[in-house]
C-alpha cells in the first residue's frame, strides 16, 4: 500500500543521481574590514582532498566521512585561518578573514587569453582517454546508498498526538550541510551491484546483487530504483541529465557559451599538480550550474568536481541541488570514478524563506574493483535486460553481508533508520495517511486483499447515459503476485442500463513481461478517441467536455498475450470479438436508408515493439516506460475473420508507428510521433481508421484539438504529431515574464489519408455497407493544425492555443471548430 509511494520518492533520486560518522560543516566567509562576503575562498579539511571554494554569497558546505577535526579557509591577499570542528556531527563555522599587506615590484598587465581556456581545451581533447564512458570496456562494483529526509519540521509535528504516535522518531533528527537546517530521516536504501559497460557491442548493464529499502517489502520492485547505473553524473558529457533536466556541463565542448571561468589556484595533491577552476553561469535562461572543477595538469583528467544549482534557474520543485564527483587513476593508470554524490532539496516552494515542509534526498555511489579493457563475461553478454536483479528476493540479506560490502560503516543513526521506519509503519495514523496518499497516486483504495476504484470513475455524466455511477475493484498482490482479477459495474440514469466488465491478468515472469490478459465488457466507448484521451467514465472528461462526445455501446471480449523476448523486443498476439450498437448520436444506415442495429467484428492480431536502451520500471502486473534516447518502433497486423460472429467481416489491417524524443539542449526537446496504416477489404465505417478527435478542453498530444469525432476516416493514412518544448529559452529573456518561469511550446499536427470506393460511405451511390454519419468525409486533402502553448504556469498547468489551418469551411452536420484552447496538467522538473 505505502510501498509505491516510497518507491516513487526513491525514483526521484534514481532519476538524477565509517564507523566514522559523517562530519558536516557549513558557513560563510566574510572580510573583517567591511563584513562583505568573500567569493573564491578555498575551504578545505586539512590533510584531505575534500575542499571547495565559496560562492558569490561567501557560502560553503563540506561533508566527509574521513576523521577530521579542523576546517581551513585561505585566499590570496588574506591571512589563512584554521578553526576546530566537532567530528561526526554538523558544525556551523563562519570565517572572518583579515587582509594582509605585502609589497611587490612594478607589474605590467597586458591583455591576453583567459589562462583557463588552454586547460579546458586539453580536457576536451583528452576526453576519449579520460572519460570512462568512452573506454572500450570496463567493469566495477558499486555500492549505492540513498536517503530521504524530512526538513522544515513544524512545531505542529511535535503536538501531543503526534508525540504519542511518533515521539521516538525525533531521536534521529540531524542537520544538513546542504541547507543548514534540521532534518528527520524518512527512508534509507542500500544496494550493491556489478556494473558492466561495452562499446562494441554497445551496452551498459547492471547486475544488482542485493538491495534493501526501509519500509518496503517488495524488494524486487524497489531494487530497480536503488541501483547506481541510471543516476550517473558525468561531467565529461556536454549536458548532465538530472531529474530529466539537462544542465550544461562546465566541461562541455561549448561550455564557454554558458560559463565564465576563473583559474583560482594550483596545488599538489597526492603528488599530482592540480588546477582549481571556478565557473559561474553567464545567464540563467537555461539550466546551468555553479561551482568548481579540479583538473590534473599532466593528463587533463577531471580529478574532482563540486557544483550546485544557482538560484533563479528555471527548474521546478528543487530548492537546492549539489553534485560532487571524485576520480582517481585506477586499472592500467586510466582514470575512473571513486565517489559520486547528489543532494537535492525538494519543495513546493523554491524560496529559501519558505517554511513549508520539504524533502532532502541524498544519493551516494562508491566504486571499487575497477577493471578497464577486459572482456565482458559471456554470462553478462547473454543477459536480456540492462538492469538485472540477481535474486528474486534481493532484500533477504543479513546485516553481516552489508557490513562486508559497505566501503564505510554506517553511523548509529543511519543503522537505526531501518528499525525506526519499520516501527513507524505499525502506527495506525501512519497507515491511514499513506493509504490516502497511495490512493491519490494509484487510483485505488487498497484494503489488504481488494483495491476499490478507480475513484475518478465513481461518478460522471454524458449525453447518452446521463448521470453515471460506477463501482469497481481488483485484487491486490496480497492475494497473488501472478494473477490479478478485476471488475466493475455501472449504471446510467438516462439510458437506465446496467454495464460492466471484468479482467484477468496472469503474469508468468517478473524480469521480462510475459503476461496473458483476458477482458470482457459491456459498456459505452468513444470510437476514434486519442491514445491519451480521458476515458469515457472519467469525471474530468465530463467536467471538461465540449458537449460533442458521440458514445457507442460496445460488447467486447479480448485475449492478449505479451511476450518480451529481451529488453527492448516485445511481441503481442491476441484475438478480439465485438459488437458495436447504433444509437441516436451514432446512427447506422444502409445506402438504401434501412437502419442497422449493430455491426460485428472478429479478428486476430499480432504486434511488435522495438526499443533500445529504454528505461522501464516493472511492477508485478504493470510496467512504466521511463523513456529512451532512441526512437521506439511499433508494428501491428490484424485479420478479420468472416462469420466468426454473425455478420463479421474479412479484412486485413497493417499499422506502424515511430516515436522519438530528440534532446536539443539548450533549446529544449521535441516529441515526434509518426503513424501510418492500410486496411485491405470492405468494412463498415466503425472499423475504418477514425481519426483522433478531441471532444474535451483537455489537451491530448495524440489527438487533433480542432477535429470533431467522426469528422474524418481513412483506409490508408499517415499522421504526425510534433511538439517542441523550449524550456523557457525565449520567455526567460523577457524582463517581467522570466520571473514567472513560464515555458513555451510549439505544436503542429496533421493527417493525410484516402478512402477506396468500397469504403467511402460519404458519396452518392456508395458501394459501402453503411452510410457515414453526417459530415464525415475522407481526408484526401491533408488536415493540419498548429499552435503554441505556455507550460509551467504555477509549475503545474499548460494552456495551448491551436488553430485549424485546413478544412476550415463549414460542413453539413458538423460544427467546425477553427480555434481551440486546451488545458492540461504536467508535473515536471
State each model region's role.
Residues 45-47, 70-83:
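A short, solvent-exposed loop/turn motif at the edges and junctions
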Residues 85-111:
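Extracellular beta-sheet/turn segments enriched in Thr/Pro/Gly and aliphatic residues
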Residues 48-59:
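Short, acidic Ser/Thr/Gly-rich low-complexity loop/linker segments typical of extracellular
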Amino acid at each position: 500500500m505505502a510501498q509505491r509511494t516510497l518507491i516513487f520518492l526513491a525514483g526521484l533520486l534514481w532519476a538524477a543521481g565509517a564507523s566514522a560518522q559523517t562530519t558536516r560543516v557549513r558557513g560563510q566567509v566574510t572580510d573583517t574590514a567591511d563584513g562583505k562576503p568573500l567569493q573564491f575562498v578555498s575551504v578545505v579539511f586539512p590533510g584531505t582532498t575534500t575542499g571547495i571554494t565559496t560562492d558569490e554569497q561567501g557560502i560553503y558546505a563540506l561533508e566527509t566521512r574521513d576523521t577530521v577535526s579542523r576546517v581551513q579557509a585561505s585566499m590570496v591577499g588574506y591571512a589563512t585561518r584554521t578553526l576546530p570542528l566537532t567530528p561526526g556531527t554538523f558544525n556551523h563555522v563562519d570565517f572572518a578573514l583579515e587582509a594582509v599587506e605585502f609589497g611587490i615590484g612594478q607589474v605590467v598587465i597586458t591583455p591576453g587569453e583567459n589562462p583557463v581556456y588552454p586547460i579546458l581545451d586539453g580536457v576536451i581533447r583528452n576526453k576519449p582517454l579520460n572519460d570512462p564512458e568512452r573506454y572500450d570496456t570496463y567493469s566495477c562494483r558499486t555500492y549505492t546508498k540513498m536517503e530521504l529526509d524530512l526538513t522544515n519540521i513544524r512545531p505542529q509535528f511535535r503536538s501531543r498526538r503526534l508525540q504519542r504516535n511518533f515521539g521516538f522518531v525525533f531521536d534521529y533528527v540531524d542537520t544538513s550541510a546542504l541547507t543548514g537546517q534540521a532534518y528527520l530521516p524518512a527512508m534509507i536504501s542500500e544496494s550493491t551491484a556489478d556494473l558492466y559497460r561495452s562499446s562494441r557491442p554497445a551496452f551498459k548493464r547492471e547486475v544488482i546483487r542485493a538491495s534493501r529499502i526501509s519500509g518496503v517489502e517488495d524488494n524486487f520492485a524497489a531494487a530497480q530504483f536503488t541501483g547506481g547505473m541510471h543516476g550517473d553524473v558525468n561531467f565529461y558529457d556536454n549536458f548532465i541529465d538530472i531529474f530529466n533536466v539537462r544542465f550544461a556541463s562546465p566541461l562541455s565542448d561549448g561550455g564557454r557559451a554558458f560559463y565564465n571561468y576563473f583559474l583560482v589556484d594550483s596545488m599538489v595533491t597526492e603528488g599530482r599538480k592540480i588546477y582549481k577552476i571556478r565557473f559561474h553561469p553567464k545567464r540563467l535562461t537555461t539550466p546551468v550550474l555553479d561551482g568548481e572543477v579540479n583538473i590534473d595538469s599532466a593528463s587533463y583528467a577531471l580529478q574532482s568536481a563540486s557544483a550546485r544549482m544557482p538560484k533563479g534557474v528555471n527548474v521546478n520543485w528543487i530548492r537546492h541541488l549539489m553534485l560532487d564527483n571524485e576520480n582517481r587513476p585506477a586499472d592500467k593508470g586510466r582514470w575512473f570514478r571513486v565517489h559520486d554524490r547528489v543532494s537535492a532539496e525538494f519543495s513546493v516552494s523554491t524560496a529559501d524563506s519558505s517554511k513549508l515542509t520539504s524533502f532532502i534526498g541524498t544519493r551516494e555511489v562508491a566504486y571499487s574493483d575497477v577493471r578497464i579493457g577486459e572482456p565482458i563475461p559471456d554470462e553478462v553478454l547473454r543477459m536480456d535486460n540492462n538492469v538485472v536483479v540477481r535474486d528474486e528476493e534481493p532484500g533477504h540479506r543479513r546485516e553481516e553481508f552489508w557490513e562486508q560490502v559497505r566501503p564505510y560503516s554506517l553511523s548509529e543513526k543511519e543503522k537505526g533508520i531501518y528499525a525506526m521506519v519499520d516501527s513507524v509503519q505499525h502506527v495506525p495514523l501512519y497507515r491511514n495517511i499513506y493509504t490516502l496518499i497511495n490512493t491519490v497516486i494509484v487510483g485505488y483504495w487498497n484494503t489488504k486483499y481488494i483495491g476499490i476504484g478507480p475513484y475518478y470513475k465513481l461518478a460522471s455524466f454524458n449525453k447518452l447515459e446521463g448521470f453515471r455511477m460506477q463501482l469497481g475493484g481488483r485484487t491486490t498482490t496480497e492475494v497473488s503476485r501472478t494473477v490479478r482479477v478485476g471488475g466493475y459495474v455501472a449504471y446510467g440514469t438516462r439510458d437506465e442500463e446496467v454495464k460492466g466488465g471484468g479482467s484477468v491478468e496472469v503474469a508468468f515472469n517478473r524480469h521480462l513481461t510475459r503476461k496473458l490478459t483476458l477482458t470482457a465488457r459491456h459498456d459505452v466507448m468513444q470510437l476514434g478517441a486519442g491514445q491519451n484521451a480521458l476515458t469515457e467514465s472519467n469525471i474530468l472528461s465530463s467536467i471538461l467536455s465540449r458537449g460533442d462526445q458521440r458514445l457507442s455501446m460496445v460488447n467486447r471480449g479480448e485475449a492478449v498475450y505479451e511476450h518480451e523476448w529481451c529488453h527492448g523486443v516485445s511481441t503481442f498476439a491476441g484475438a478480439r470479438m465485438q459488437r458495436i450498437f447504433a444509437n441516436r448520436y451514432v446512427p447506422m444506415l444502409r445506402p438504401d436508408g434501412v437502419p442497422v442495429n449493430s455491426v460485428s467484428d472478429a479478428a486476430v492480431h499480432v504486434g511488435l515493439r522495438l526499443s533500445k536502451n529504454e528505461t522501464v520500471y516493472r511492477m508485478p502486473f504493470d510496467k512504466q516506460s521511463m523513456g529512451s534516447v532512441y526512437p521506439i518502433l511499433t508494428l501491428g497486423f490484424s485479420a478479420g475473420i468472416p462469420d466468426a460472429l454473425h455478420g463479421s467481416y474479412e479484412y486485413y489491417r497493417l499499422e506502424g508507428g515511430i516515436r522519438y524524443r530528440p534532446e536539443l539542449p539548450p533549446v529544449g526537446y521535441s516529441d515526434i510521433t509518426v503513424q501510418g496504416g492500410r486496411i485491405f477489404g470492405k468494412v463498415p465505417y466503425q472499423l475504418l481508421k477514425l481519426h483522433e478527435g478531441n471532444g474535451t478542453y483537455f489537451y491530448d498530444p495524440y489527438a487533433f484539438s480542432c477535429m470533431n469525432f467522426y469528422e474524418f476516416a481513412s483506409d490508408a493514412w499517415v499522421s504526425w504529431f510534433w511538439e517542441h518544448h523550449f524550456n523557457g529559452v525565449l520567455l526567460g529573456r523577457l524582463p517581467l515574464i522570466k520571473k514567472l518561469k513560464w515555458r513555451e511550446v510549439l505544436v503542429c499536427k496533421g493527417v493525410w489519408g484516402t478512402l477506396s470506393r468500397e469504403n467511402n460511405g460519404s458519396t452518392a451511390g456508395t458501394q459501402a455497407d453503411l452510410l457515414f454519419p453526417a459530415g464525415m468525409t475522407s481526408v484526401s486533402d491533408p488536415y493540419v493544425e498548429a499552435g503554441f502553448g505556455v507550460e509551467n504556469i504555477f509549475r503545474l498547468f499548460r494552456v495551448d492555443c491551436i488553430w485549424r489551418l485546413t478544412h476550415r469551411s463549414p460542413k453539413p452536420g458538423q460544427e467546425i471548430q477553427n480555434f481551440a484552447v486546451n488545458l492540461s496538467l504536467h508535473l515536471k522538473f
